[in-house]
């Protein structure tokens, strides 16, 4: 007998131990468009909205994938429902019903543009990763292939920025108030960067539109936090065993979740505070602390742990020297670069993060965290190094994860393995040319201006990076262990 598929009709058949929506999903209406319907959105923002829909059913989500139809094809037959597995010492399964519509922009572009122009849509949220903003430094990269296409074909965009501009243009023409565009990606000052990118793209074809956006639309900054490992076959099997129905794409995350949003909305908003969201006038301090004290150590664990042939974050935290190094890095090197915040205790925050990293129920693969290093390290580590240099603070420990990333590139290139990174081809070419000698290799890597332009001319940084690279060479576990113990 075939196993039934998760759907609204199947909700009544689920075990009572499974949490299900406290509202009727069919009775909700769409008020939010989300660009980038990946696992993090479905584990984070959609869960907060799910908590609010019983009270206000007008904020359901249209989830848009910009390129791949996989999420749409998996969840549309399930009425948008999916399972969230909350992982800790008391694991729990929950069905999320906040997504009422799923679209793929690659083959449903008119529907996406129509939804962005819908007067009922008052909020557009984004999780498109750092590379999805098509930035060069802090500004929109007009030479980026997708942006160049969107300038030439503004009514048929490819990029997330292009879709926002096209949607806002249609609203302006129709006399409809703009939506709030809310970035939920790990970018420092993400709302400001998004606003600059949208206005700059609009300026290329329609200066009146750019002015209207600048005057009337808002782009709040936000900070998001919850560790969300990739879905694997073990999760799919566990969910099916527990539910008795088939879920094509369940997701998992730790129980801890945080969302801080700058309270700056131009067209109404959900009652976020009732779902546990922190609304603040200024979130820069929260965002910086998270990027530097959580995301930067995550990257350190990913690259150093990979060189030690470890598989998961929990495995890496079980390595005594690596765990001690990361804790010292957070306490002695990163914390001094943060500005004091009322009510914020750095040591308590560090202790909580380390406990989350050690959670054995979370199989967060180091290989997944290692993706897109060229985009991540600039905001997670290199800015911290720049601030430390400006303050006359030591940077040697901060440079070790950067050097580990370079050895990771070298190893991937030497093994003929693909590098998952927007600059993968350029970095792999450099990796193939390396010898393991710091004096030869570091100058070659420093030519990648998109990563190192702000630091490559600083002799203190170059010297510290060369020292760390040499200490790790040739990238074997024994040399990594020795470098961690220095």
Question: What role is predicted for each listed range?
Answer:
Residues 1-486:
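Substrate/ligand-engaging "lid" and interaction regions
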